[in-house]
Design a protein with these regions (language model features):
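Short, basic phosphate-binding NTP loop
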Residues: 2-108, 290, 298-300, 390-397, ...
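Phosphate-binding loop of NTP-binding sites
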Residues: 3-4, 22-23, 59-65, 72-213, ...
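Nucleotide phosphate-binding/pyrophosphate-handling subdomain across enzymes
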Residues: 4, 14-24, 132, 254-359
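Short internal beta-strands
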Residues: 27-34, 209-213, 335-338, 357-366
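Short beta-strand "acidic-cap" motif of Rossmann-like dinucleotide-binding folds
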Residues: 28-32, 133-134, 154, 230, ...
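Short, charged/polar "capping" segments at the starts of alpha-helices
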Residues: 35-41, 60-61, 74-77, 215-220, ...
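C-terminal helical cap/extension that packs against the catalytic core
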Residues: 42-43, 348-403
Length: 433
């Protein structure tokens, strides 16, 4: 009789894990708490022999499972986790399941901000010489790739996914930065840090650990890691004379970098280090960096119109991410669209950045009142409140700034389906003008 595996949720990663598990001969059960499911997907899985339930997590489905594969969105304090733990059923992430079933080396990218851009950039640089697709938290389940023939899997790993690994070992692991986010989910800042730290420490330590030299928490953490290479640092990889250097060799001048802002120079440094570690030459690395385009919704240049440049940074769902975008603009008249569903994060540092770099703030969404109060408390008063994204854009254009920047520092769910939807609404309206 074949081994029973339980898959939690009909997410993209859950569906991919179910298909892969069937191909490996497992008896696959999928349990989805939501009532509404995609009937086509359900039928496709059922035709493969997968048993599916939705609307509840029944005892019949849970009992007898050898292990469970979770979807990233299910919090560890959930009822289903409690029930599985009581039965001593091990819960792993889809990333772990993929790792256990392939010999293809993983390049793991994690961090609070910058990990998606870095993941996409690393894959793009390596594609000159290797087959190295993106996967993980970026929207491509690794189990959908491991039957194919690749040199590397460039995997964006969230704190949720990292926490649910035990044996996962990357060839190279990169930690872009660490700032408070997802604290509710993990139940505290230290838990959030430790979740990410797992994939850098024994028994899961990578061959090489790439860490941010400018992040004090990561600099301290580096003492616990092996084979550390720092970025944004004078010795390993950093900026000198307006160029990025690696081990004393000039790789690319800042003016040739397609991405703006110091945070993006850091992302490029991560890409350079990884490319050098897998044996690429400087001219190929430089050529690939120059041809790279930023992923959507991450300080994405939308258009120039009547002397105004529009940037969509809808992925900035916390103040730290918005600070990074705000600090990218110097000596320009910038109109910033802020707001959305408030995460109740500390706004002090962001207010300081706004004071330095922003001319006008346009507020939308549920966070408006708290953001206005904090901005005024920190000495910024050029604030305009609008009801919709379209109204905010129209008002911003009427001010004739150099830049209109959408970088909300908030979740999107008060007015939009997702940060992607918010970014699309911004772009569509700007492009319709």
């Amino acid at each position: 009789m074949s081994e029973k595996v339980l898959i939690l949720g009909l997410s993209k990663s859950g569906i991919a894990a179910a298909k892969f598990a069937v191909s490996k001969g497992y008896d696959v059960y999928v349990t989805e708490k939501k009532n509404e499911v995609n009937l086509e997907q359900v039928k496709e899985l059922q035709n493969l022999g997968v048993k599916i339930e939705h609307g509840s997590h029944s005892e019949e489905f849970i009992s007898g499972a050898s292990f469970a594969i979770t979807s990233p969105g299910i919090p560890p304090k959930s009822e289903i986790f409690r029930r599985l733990n009581e039965k001593n059923i091990k819960i792993i992430s889809e990333v772990e399941f993929a790792y256990l079933n392939t010999k293809t080396p993983f390049i793991a990218i994690t961090g609070t901000n910058g990990k998606t851009t870095t993941t996409a950039l690393v894959s793009h640089i390596l594609s000159k010489k290797f087959s190295a697709p993106v996967c993980g938290n970026i929207g491509v389940p690794p189990t959908s790739l491991i039957e194919e023939n690749h040199d590397f899997l460039v995997c964006e790993i969230s704190s949720y996914q990292a926490q649910m690994t035990e044996k996962f070992k990357a060839k190279i692991a990169c930690w872009t930065n660490f700032t408070p986010d997802h604290i509710d989910w993990h139940g505290g800042l230290e838990n959030y840090f430790n979740a990410k730290a797992k994939i850098f420490l024994p028994p899961q330590e990578p061959e090489f650990a790439i860490l941010n030299a400018q992040d004090t928490k990561l600099k301290e953490f580096s003492k616990q890691c092996q084979n550390v290479i720092f970025f944004d640092d004078g010795n390993d990889c950093g900026i000198k004379n307006n160029s990025i250097f690696y081990k004393g060799e000039e790789i690319i001048s800042l003016k040739d970098c397609p991405l703006v802002g110091h945070h993006n120079y850091q992302n490029i440094m991560c890409g350079i280090i990884i490319a050098k570690l897998v044996g690429m030459n400087n001219s190929d690395i430089r050529e690939q960096i120059m041809s790279f385009r930023a992923p959507e919704h991450r300080l994405e240049k939308v258009r120039e119109m009547d002397g105004i440049t529009f940037f969509n940074d809808s992925k900035a769902t916390n103040p730290e991410a918005s600070i990074v975008a705000i600090d990218s603009f110097n000596n320009q008249n910038v109109a910033l669209i802020l707001g959305g569903r408030d995460k109740n994060t500390d706004l002090t540092e962001m207010c300081h950045s706004i004071n330095k770099h922003i001319k006008t703030v346009l507020l939308i969404g549920e966070a408006t009142e708290r953001f206005e109060e904090n901005l005024k408390k920190n000495g910024f008063s050029n604030i305009i409140k609008e009801h919709t994204m379209e109204d905010a854009i129209d008002k911003a254009i009427s001010l004739k700034p150099d830049v209109v920047l959408l970088s909300p520092a908030c979740a999107s769910f008060d007015m939009f389906k997702s940060y992607e939807h918010r970014g699309e609404v911004f772009k569509d309206y700007v492009l319709s003008k």
